[in-house]
Amino acid sequence: EIKDSMCEEQKRSGVLLAGLEHLDDRYLKAVGYATKSKKGNGQLPKMVLVGDIVGDDADEVARVTSEVVRIANTRSGEGFVAVSSEARKKFWLDRKRTAAISKHTNAFKINEDVVIPLPRMAEYTDGIERINIELSLRNKLALCDALLEFFAQGELPLGQSEDRISAAELLEDRVHQAQALVQQVRAQWADWLANVATLFPELQEHRLRASWKTQLKAPMAHIFSGQAFQPVLAELNKIHQRVLKGRVWVALHMHAGDGNVHTNIPVNSDDYAMLQTAHEAVARIMVLARSLDGVISGEHGIGITKLEF
């Protein structure tokens, strides 16, 4: 809508849309974006568009910029305008920090740029979001499996207790409670994954949310309450961090004015399973792009990972 409006405006007044860049919420988190909105208690927006609107007449530029803000408002968005040189520089600074997306993987990522027709862009971002939801749920199921393996090993690490109680007495049925909890949560998450096509709107809007903190960590702290069980809880957190480190996800930033989308997958180069999962995601991304009448050769052309497609 912005692009169409600006194309007409260029013919009418000569005001140009010189650039239009996009960052999704994963990129916003990576670059440390400080939201300008007063809504949502400071939460990050789902995406940010940064545009350069230029012209010879300052009043015309201001009028057209206000129209772009109005378009954003009609789509539950907000618009913020930088007029001075210093303010404009700050607006564009976040876009320049996009390499931060792979800082947790020592700057290693699979970068697949594709070009999508602008009228199909929303379908592409939805498709990527579905891939991300599936990857997240698969990682959550792997976490459950790792936790069940930990509880099945027998002896759990225990701290000192002021009372002279044996480890067996301390644990009593706590392990069984923990196992039942994990199995119950795992069954729910597995059902969501199996029915992701139907449940996608609820999962995308976080009306359904697979949460380690609320569904597993908090109940575990209740089951294993007391000083003697601190080592158990510490080990559960270690397991979570280890499994989370291998989670694959897809982040998007794009030259939104022409449909060139950088589809980036940060990976640990020494994690074979993670690399395999990432390449499976690439295959789905290529199919998705072409199904929307897009092309898989963006501004960076064809590289090793695209060769087979």
Regions of interest found by a model, annotated:
Residues E1-G298, I302-F309:
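Noncatalytic alpha-helical scaffold of FAD-dependent oxidoreductases
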